Amino acid sequence: MANILVVTEHLKGEFQDITFEMLGKAKEIAQSTGGSCSAMVFGSMSGQTDQMGAADTVITAEVGDDYNPEAYAAAVKSVVSANSPDLIMIGSTSMGIDIANPVSTALDIPTVSFCADIVAAGGGFTCTSQMYGGKMNVVSSVDGALISMVLAGSFNADTG
């Protein structure tokens, strides 16, 4: 059973496509394993949780409307500590880099970057990452909890 947390991204009051890509993939993995999909929403975007249709649960973090990397990372650390998701999906974006690394370090959870595909495998996950501008694919398998930094455009945003 894979319980998944999707860390949403927004800009100027709009959720970014990467959010819906991750939600769709998270829902697919959760359904295939009998797990659940949660979305984490920040600041005033908590008023737009109706857009998180693929999520079974929406978790809100009151961190203000202006992006603050330290506050966002602290909020994610708190939610991960409280909920112990098996997979934390974060966009492989500038915001994702700000958040994933401190969470990974503080909670001792491995991170796989530039993920173009993720599948549940046994008690963990197998990720395919694109490297060198897509010229090389690297397959990584991780047992246990994982932070996956998802490459934008890897999944269909319409499914999320």
Task: Show where each model-derived region lies.
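N-terminal glycine-rich FAD/FM-binding segment characteristic of electron-transfer flavoproteins
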Residues: M1-G160
